[in-house]
Amino acid sequence: MRINPTTSGPGVSTLEEKILGRIAQIIGPVLDVAFPPGKMPNIYNALVVKGRDTVGQQINVTCEVQQLLGNNRVRAVAMSATDGLMRGMEVIDTGAPLSVPVGGATLGRIFNVLGEPVDNLGPVDTRTTSPIHRSAPAFIQLDTKLSIFETGIKVVDLLAPYRRGGKIGLFGGAGVGKTVLIMELINNIAKAHGGVSVFGGVGERTREGNDLYMEMKESGVINEENIAESKVALVYGQMNEPPGARMRVGLTALTMAEYFRDVNEQDVLLFIDNIFRFVQAGSEVSALLGRMPSAVGYQPTLSTEMGSLQERITSTKEGSITSIQAVYVPADDLTDPAPATTFAHLDATTVLSRGLAAKGIYPAVDPLDSTSTMLQPRIVGEEHYETAQRVKQTSQRYKELQDIIAILGLDELSEEDRLTVSRARKIERFLSQPFFVAEVFTGSPGKYVGLAETIRGFQLILSGELDGLPEQAFYLVGNIDEATAKAMNLEVESKLKK
């Protein structure tokens, strides 16, 4: 760890003692800076421009060196707006990459790309900082054992299980429950794994960032009374920020997550919303730096940039970073270079369905579209694999029969198909689950369902033992015992009504 060179504090050498350069050219967020001969900064060094603009306003802009141009000049990308900068202004080489605060003091706080708190709750109470550019863990440090990361969410654990230290793509439009699913995962990892979460908002709407913060406070994921008890750190570089900030904010969030993994030896959840915006920002910066564009106008370094981020997200012998990344697919074209490059790194996909959300089945995870490389008998065991396959087969058959049901009705189906439809409808409802973070909206207490309980429940439905129970008994319950208890209550209620 090193002291953050871009922030002043006791024991920090003042920036004035550092090497000075001068701005030679400004083109939007890109600065060319001239330095004295023999005193050139390294690639990725942080440069700071301090001074006053023409109306006397204080300027403090941090940039990152991207290219060494020759003739003692470097080209840097600004992390904030370059309004008010002028040629000839002094630029200070900090001598190190951007460094951000890490550790427990970051929990419950909101940061920008530079690691500065932006939540008006005062400075961060930590002296420990870490540079955002690091190499991925060496191969001998990796934990190569394939193990499932239990989330306590039935549909995820059974049909598209997450890998511990893996990368998951989260696909879904607006209003289908992405935010609530993310908050439930943050809550469950804290309770079941004693882990923490880091949320990186990359190039999305500022309103969404604000909504997420408010909902986290409401649901208790961020504890306002005792901020240290919070379970998540938030890092934002939203749509209104320059491309440099959007390109680097993912690394800022990842650096905070790496500290929890490597030093605190915890299981960490890293959320990136949206990974496409990371690629988009890299494309903008690449064009500004004058690089020749590649396919569809993307940067020629697309695979390298994506790899340098994704390779750092992994399990080591100390702890793990499991990453859930929202993926925007431009024009629904899965062959676009940005999503195609992302898919190469994913271990599982969780697809949220508007149709299920419209039926009121939450979480609205599509059991047929969601996939996972972990769903193999040698990894999850024969029992889990067989149960998952039978659930998918039953759901698929029900999907095929829906057109016939819509035209001719249930009565025209064969006895076997009627039984399949009945069980599939029970399965569909049993895949729903009350969430802890949604208690304040639904009034139903949240449920964490272990994997063994989940498998047992679906086996009982598939075996036909519960064919006599009504469908609504399976809706928004935890384990199968709650469904049978709910069925008895429904029976008592119907008798009382008579």
Curated annotation (Swiss-Prot):
Pfam families linked to this entry: ATP-synt_ab (PF00006), ATP-synt_ab_N (PF02874), ATP-synt_VA_C (PF22919)
Membrane topology designation: Peripheral membrane protein
Keyword terms of this UniProt record: ATP synthesis, ATP-binding, CF(1), Chloroplast, Hydrogen ion transport, Ion transport, Membrane, Nucleotide-binding, Plastid, Thylakoid, Translocase, Transport
Catalytic activity: ATP + H2O + 4 H(+)(in) = ADP + phosphate + 5 H(+)(out)
Cystine bridges: none
GO molecular function: ATP binding; ATP hydrolysis activity; proton-transporting ATP synthase activity, rotational mechanism
Coiled coil region boundaries: none
E.C. number(s) listed in UniProt: 7.1.2.2
SMART domains given in the database record: AAA
GO terms for cellular component: chloroplast thylakoid membrane; mitochondrion; proton-transporting ATP synthase complex
Gene3D superfamilies, alphabetized: 2.40.10.170, Bovine Mitochondrial F1-atpase, Atp Synthase Beta Chain, Chain D, domain 3, P-loop containing nucleotide triphosphate hydrolases
Domain of life: Eukaryota
Residues the entry annotates as binding ATP: G172, G173, A174, G175, V176, G177, K178, T179
GO biological process, one term: proton motive force-driven mitochondrial ATP synthesis
Annotated localization: Plastid, Chloroplast thylakoid membrane
Function of the protein: Produces ATP from ADP in the presence of a proton gradient across the membrane. The catalytic sites are hosted primarily by the beta subunits.
Sequence similarity: Belongs to the ATPase alpha/beta chains family.
UniProt-listed PANTHER family: ATP SYNTHASE, ATP SYNTHASE SUBUNIT BETA, MITOCHONDRIAL
Subunit structure: F-type ATPases have 2 components, CF(1) - the catalytic core - and CF(0) - the membrane proton channel. CF(1) has five subunits: alpha(3), beta(3), gamma(1), delta(1), epsilon(1). CF(0) has four main subunits: a(1), b(1), b'(1) and c(9-12).
Protein name: ATP synthase subunit beta, chloroplastic
Annotated organism of origin: Chloranthus spicatus
